[in-house]
């Protein structure tokens, strides 16, 4: 199908930037807290700051907002300490007035947390589509504030998405960067920056994240669940088996693309790889040095999730299709698409060029992604393959959406070819903001919404990963509100 255009919800808003610096000793005064942009409140637990206000999800009829309440007087290992509070979210039409004190009570929709919590994620439903709304979040009277000056959060105004006509045809959920087997989050090299960990004895956070994604997909009535790369930490046999066990708890169908962490690994890097099948790279896939070394690669991931560098097609109940692409290389984090796979992908797309199609691959493909991600262009799909891939999309008007993970961030990128397809990078399931992207299919388009992981374990982990990267995780991962919430007309 041809697309008539893209409608976005909300304006430009960076994720809430934390100013926390790890390594600072525990504080004895509020002035040393990194959460400086906040309101001070008090309850039976003591003084707290209501901070980190962030608009998470905007749909045609709902608004989801999150914030946290931190101890106003102390830090632990340079990070703020959560304080349980009662939370409240109030939402009202902007047309009723911007000052809540003068708004008619009947115009205000109000929801409360179910109990005390340090992390608050509240949703107001029953809103009108394509309408400006004001909102106010507070914990026991302390008004939650964004940590830095964000657009929607500072203005406290959002616009709901337009409503697509007709009945909902199908919902699918797409997650990425789960990293089953990983034990520390937020590091670049070694233990730097200081990582987030779960407390001793707690369930591993990648498993908490994937279980929450699966539960969220089940609650949404999703027919299918997709993991777009980096399902595992390093594709060790026990990681692959555990990931498969968790995915099999989803009541519908699931499919997985391969990410750089899921690539075949060298047997000499870890004795555990020895139990897995030998992987023979195709001709020309290895450098001369690698060939001379006679490297022994093992593909534990492929034994459960399919052959490397081959595309797959998943037929949707709504009449569309999802096409998965393997963009991994050997021995590096960058991306490539082998010529045989590129040819096969071209055949798939050309076979039904106007059929509504979502394409997913782990590595981002646009020049904008290449030159804005912290890992430099070497971190994404190589430029030659990226242009070949985009030209295939350009020749296939039915491609409505191209989804990538890998960068652990939310971003809507401009393509480098003349296409109306939307190119998205989607946030990681295991690190802030922790969740998955829900796609709802209608006759005339797709509703795209990021949904935060739910549950006490998931929220506890969200607070921990929120303060990785020296508190910059929201700026690096959340992206803009309209990169996570949009309507694609197709």
Please provide the spans of the model-predicted regions.
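C-terminal region of N-terminal signal peptides and the immediate post-cleavage residues
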Residues: 16-35
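N-terminal export signals
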Residues: 2-21
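Acidic/histidine-rich helix-loop elements
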Residues: 176-208, 265, 269-276, 288, ...
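Extended active-site neighborhood of metal-dependent phosphoesterases/phosphodiesterases
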Residues: 140-144, 152-164, 241-346, 417-425, ...
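N-terminal active-site segment of His-dependent metallophosphoesterases
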Residues: 45-46, 50-62, 69-74, 79-82, ...
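A short C-terminal boundary segment appended to hydrolase-like catalytic domains
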Residues: 46, 443-490
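His/acidic metal-ligating clusters that form di-metal
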Residues: 215-224, 315, 321-323, 332-422, ...
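Beta-strand-enriched, solvent-exposed domains that form extended recognition/catalytic surfaces
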Residues: 33-161
């Amino acid at each position: 199908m041809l697309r008539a255009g893209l409608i976005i919800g909300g304006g430009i808003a960076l994720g809430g930037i934390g100013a926390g610096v790890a390594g600072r000793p525990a504080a004895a005064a509020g002035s040393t807290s990194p959460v400086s942009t906040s309101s001070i409140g008090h309850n039976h637990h003591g003084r707290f700051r209501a901070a980190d206000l962030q608009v998470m999800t905007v749909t045609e009829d709902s608004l989801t907002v999150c914030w946290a309440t931190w101890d106003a007087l102390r830090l632990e290992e340079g990070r703020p300490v959560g304080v349980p509070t009662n939370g409240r979210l109030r939402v009202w039409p902007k047309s009723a007035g911007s000052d809540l004190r003068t708004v008619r009570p009947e115009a205000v929709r109000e929801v409360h947390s179910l109990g005390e919590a340090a992390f608050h994620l509240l949703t107001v439903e029953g809103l009108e589509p394509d309408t400006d709304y004001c909102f106010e979040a507070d914990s026991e009277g302390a008004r939650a504030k964004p940590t830095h000056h964000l657009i929607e959060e500072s203005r406290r105004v959002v616009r709901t998405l337009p409503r697509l006509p007709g009945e909902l045809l199908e919902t699918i959920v797409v997650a990425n960067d789960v990293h089953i087997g990983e034990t520390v989050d937020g590091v670049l090299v070694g233990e730097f920056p200081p990582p987030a960990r779960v407390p001793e004895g707690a369930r591993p956070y990648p498993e908490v994240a994937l279980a929450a994604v699966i539960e969220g997909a089940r609650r949404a009535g999703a027919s299918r669940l997709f993991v777009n790369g980096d399902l595992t930490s390093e594709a060790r046999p026990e990681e692959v088996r555990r990931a498969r066990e968790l995915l099999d708890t989803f009541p519908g169908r699931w499919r997985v693309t391969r990410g750089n962490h899921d690539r075949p690994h060298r047997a000499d890097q870890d004795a555990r790889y020895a139990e897995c099948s030998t992987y023979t790279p195709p001709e020309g896939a290895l450098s001369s040095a690698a060939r001379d070394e006679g490297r022994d690669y093992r593909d534990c991931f492929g034994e459960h999730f399919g052959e490397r560098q081959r595309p797959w097609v998943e037929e949707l109940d709504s009449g569309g299709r999802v096409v998965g692409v393997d963009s991994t290389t050997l021995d590096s984090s960058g991306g490539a698409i082998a010529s045989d796979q590129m040819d096969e992908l071209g055949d798939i797309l050309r076979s039904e060029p106007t059929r509504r199609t979502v394409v997913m691959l782990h590595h981002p493909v646009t020049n904008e992604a290449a030159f804005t991600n912290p890992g430099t262009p070497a971190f994404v799909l190589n430029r030659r393959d990226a242009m070949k891939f985009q030209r295939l999309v350009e020749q296939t008007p039915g491609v409505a959406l191209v989804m990538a993970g890998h960068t652990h961030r939310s971003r809507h990128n401009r393509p480098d070819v003349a296409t109306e397809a939307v190119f998205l990078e989607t946030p990681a399931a295991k690190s802030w903001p922790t969740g998955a992207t829900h796609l709802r299919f209608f006759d005339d388009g797709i509703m795209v919404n990021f949904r935060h992981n739910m549950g006490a374990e998931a929220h506890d982990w969200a607070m921990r990963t929120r303060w990785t990267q020296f508190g910059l995780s929201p700026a690096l991962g959340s992206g803009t509100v309209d990169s996570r919430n949009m309507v694609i007309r197709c």
